């Protein structure tokens, strides 16, 4: 997967929609559910967005400098992004998914050309500043607004959970720490399954869920949370009524059929 970000477009869109700043991590978190990202490029006059540079660097983006003085009619960032995307399309056949982070309708011809070359195109933009033409041309369009709302809900849930855990802390025995760690692992699995089921119908293979978790959290090891294998983690989720899991007789692995009654 390759990500091309028209930073100024989404930054302005966020500001006009009342968001403090554009958070690229919210976008990457969603994209990592879909596959591995091998190219990340962001285009802007970075002198105008100095405070955003650090976050983009930390997210491993290559920052392409497009001085504002060079803008003449057609946005130079748009042109450079299109050239780089098409170059990658024609030279790197293994990159099969292109993500355009922008709501600009000027990218519609690029989207069409990429799809002509059998590429999947995902758009990401702020709802109020995303062109209907661009949205309709993409195979999928993710609104930043939805990502932001999901992040807020998750933050509230985490704070509520932390408060409950703190209230319980004085009564905890030494074994409680291990139990708490298991809860963290189970929560991560449930979040991942929920995100995957948004894009897929039917069941999920346990191995797929672990692959996505490793993309999101490269340091993840189930043994840290007290599980001998990832399958043990899934079985525990099933026994707690969080997931409905069954063993696949052919592969010997586990299939997740959906959420349990206690999820």
Tell where the protein language model's regions lie, with residue ranges.
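Short, glycine/polar-rich helix-capping loops at beta-to-alpha or helix-loop-helix junctions
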Residues: 49-53, 126-134
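Acidic beta-strand-to-loop metal/phosphate-binding motif
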Residues: 43-45, 96-103, 110, 114, ...
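Short gly/pro/ser/thr-enriched loop/turn and capping motifs at secondary-structure boundaries
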Residues: 10-11, 70-72, 128-133, 149-151
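Short, structured coil segments at secondary-structure junctions
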Residues: 59, 117, 136-138
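Conserved phosphate-handling catalytic cores of large alpha/beta enzymes
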Residues: 135-136, 140-149, 158-163
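Domain-level signal for Mg2+-assisted phosphodiester chemistry and nucleotide/NA-binding surfaces
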Residues: 1-90, 110-112, 120
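Short, well-ordered beta-strand core segments
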Residues: 63, 98, 121, 141-142
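N-terminal regulatory modules in eukaryotic regulatory proteins
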Residues: 124, 154-263
């Amino acid at each position: 997967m390759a990500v091309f970000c028209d930073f100024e477009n989404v930054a302005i869109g966020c500001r006009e929609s009342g968001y403090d700043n554009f958070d690229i991590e919210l976008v990457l978190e969603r994209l990592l559910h879909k596959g591995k990202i091998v190219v990340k490029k962001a285009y802007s006059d970075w002198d105008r967005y100095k405070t955003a540079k650090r976050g983009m660097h930390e997210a491993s983006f290559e920052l392409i400098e497009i001085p504002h003085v060079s803008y003449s009619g057609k946005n130079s960032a748009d042109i450079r992004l299109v050239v780089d995307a098409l170059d990658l399309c024609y030279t790197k056949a293994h990159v099969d998914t292109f993500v355009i982070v922008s709501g600009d309708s000027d990218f519609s011809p690029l989207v069409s050309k990429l799809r002509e070359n059998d590429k999947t195109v995902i758009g990401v933009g702020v709802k109020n500043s995303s062109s209907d033409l661009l949205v309709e041309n993409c195979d999928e369009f993710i609104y930043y607004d939805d990502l932001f709302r999901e992040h807020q809900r998750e933050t509230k849930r985490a704070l509520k959970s932390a408060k409950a855990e703190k209230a319980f802390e004085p009564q905890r025995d030494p074994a409680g720490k291990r139990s708490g760690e298991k809860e963290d692992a189970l929560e991560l699995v449930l979040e991942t399954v929920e995100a995957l089921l948004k894009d897929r119908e039917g069941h999920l293979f346990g191995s797929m869920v672990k692959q996505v978790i490793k993309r999101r959290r490269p340091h993840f090891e189930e043994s840290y949370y007290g599980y001998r294998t990832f399958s043990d983690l899934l079985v525990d989720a099933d026994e707690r009524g969080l997931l409905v899991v069954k063993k696949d007789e052919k592969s010997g692995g586990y299939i997740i059929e959906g959420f349990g009654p206690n999820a």
